[in-house]
Amino acid sequence: MDSAADPELASAVVAARASVRARLRAEQAERLVEPFDPALYNHQADLAENILFGEAVGPAFAPARLARQPYLRAVLEAEGLTRPLTEIGLAVARNSVEIFADLPADHPLFDAFSLFPAAERGFFEDLVARQTDAILRRGPAGHRDREALIGLALRYNETRHRFGLIDAALEARIVGARHAFARMLPAPLRGAVEFHDPARVNPAASLEENLLFGRISYGEAGAERRVRALVRRVLAEEGLEDAVYRLGLDSRIDPAATGALAEGAPGPRERVAIDLARCLVREPDILVVAILLEERAPANFEERLAHLRAARAGRGLIVCLPEAADPAALPPFDAVVRVAGNTVAA
């Protein structure tokens, strides 16, 4: 959301926060959303998110480079958190190596719950095997190990991963580091973080987070479904549905989100469906759709194709079928062109 481009919508979203909170209260469902509070640790966010208390803008505080970001590392050192976070990272590495030891790299559980990608598993297995105390190592190798372990700690979420590594005392120290981080942020980096502010929208955060001004609770069964249904009711009551649809159509889906960071994000099929829906909404003169062989397996394939043809009635539709497909088994097309390699065969 760009509050400068659409200040009226931004103000409406901030006002809707109060309505969402009031509705949660009325339905005795406040526990389903943990609000952003500058003075409290948010248990639905990871450790890095609790320190930043906002959204990174640009590469300076991007998750992949956060553990080696000089200013953040200086804050951790000043707040006495370098050693605790290294110890947390080592504990995470040990637990993860043990839990995922017998799983192949492409196993869905590894992608969904591991704090490091499959490509880095060998590195952490080696680190755990050779190092009993990451704090004591010196030299470039030790520096590299500590950086990797701090990176694991920054991605750790106690509510989600449940290794028992963050207690109330450490939460208070992390909140203290949050305040130091914001207070001393150098001028050149002030545009690199959009902090959460109850009085304005966060242009770098999702619309959902802006409306909730918080995170949906991991530990409550059905929380996402209940909260999102409630939010939709509030949007309808406040006349914001059309504006939200416009924002959705204007948004790009990030194809690079993986692992824990992609929890709840659309998968490959959903992204294709969203792109197809966008094309249909734009009503182009000609629409070209390629259908893979495996996509013809579902029982409702012919029904889906019929819906697509109905949606494009009176306009151009080109359907590219795999070589093994038999167009004769489908309702007749106006024309069928067979292609072999790059040559029209018939």
Regions found by a protein language model. Name each.
Residues 1-50, 55-69, 83-210, 214-232, ...:
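ABC-fold ATPase nucleotide-binding domain signature/coupling loops
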Residues 68-72, 227-231, 299-310:
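Well-ordered, non-membrane alpha-helical segments in soluble/globular domains
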Residues 71-83:
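Long, internal scaffold/assembly segments composed of regular secondary structure
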Residues 283-285, 298-331:
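Conserved catalytic loops of ABC-family nucleotide-binding domains
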Residues 289-293, 320-324, 340:
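Structural motif
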Residues 328-346:
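Conserved beta-strand-loop-alpha-helix hinge in the C-terminal portion
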